[in-house]
Amino acid sequence: FYGRPFPEVEPLLQQLAALPAPVFICMTPDTLLKKAFVQQAFSFQYDFHYPNRPARDIQPPTAEEPLLYNLLGDTERRESMVLTHEDLFVFLESVMEGKSISRVLKEQINAAYNFIFIGLPFGRWYMKILVHFLQKDANRKALKYAANHAFDEEIQAFMVDQFQIICVPARIAEFV
């Protein structure tokens, strides 16, 4: 599945790669965003979450050399991927314990003033837990936006009430 081409998302990924952001957290284990950076000859760092393994050292990311971070593993390291419910539980435990996510990445998330969530399945129970964890110590005045025209009213209300995420009723390509 992850090895096949997705020509419909390539223009969107090219646009995302051009954004001046220091961190891009991907919620898929594929390397499509990484390929978009390579195709445009942009400088970047790449890392991925590997449950229950010590975080690798990374340099503090900048807009000129951002960090691309695959939170659900990497397709080239199958054992890092979240493929089953058991993998999901191990992943969540690993994230909650905070041992396998780089200190530099945590500091970047906590210091960030802007977050853009694109295409995340906020209706899934584990996504709510994950967003809570990722933003629990983050700057409370940070602007947080989510683009997805398919959110139902209940999910939008939860996102606004619980996480102060502003839902933008636009298709992802229009939002970017």
Where are these regions (language model features)?
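Short hydrophobic-aromatic micro-motifs
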Residues: 26, 68-71, 116-117
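Active-site gating loop/helix substructures
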Residues: 42-110
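Polar/charged alpha-helical tracts
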Residues: 11-14, 18, 90, 94, ...
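Active-site periphery "cap/insert" segments of enzyme catalytic domains
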Residues: 1-60, 78, 114, 124
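Active-site metal-binding loops of divalent metal-dependent hydrolases
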Residues: 29, 73, 120
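A diffuse structural propensity rather than consistent per-protein peaks
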Residues: 7-10, 84, 152
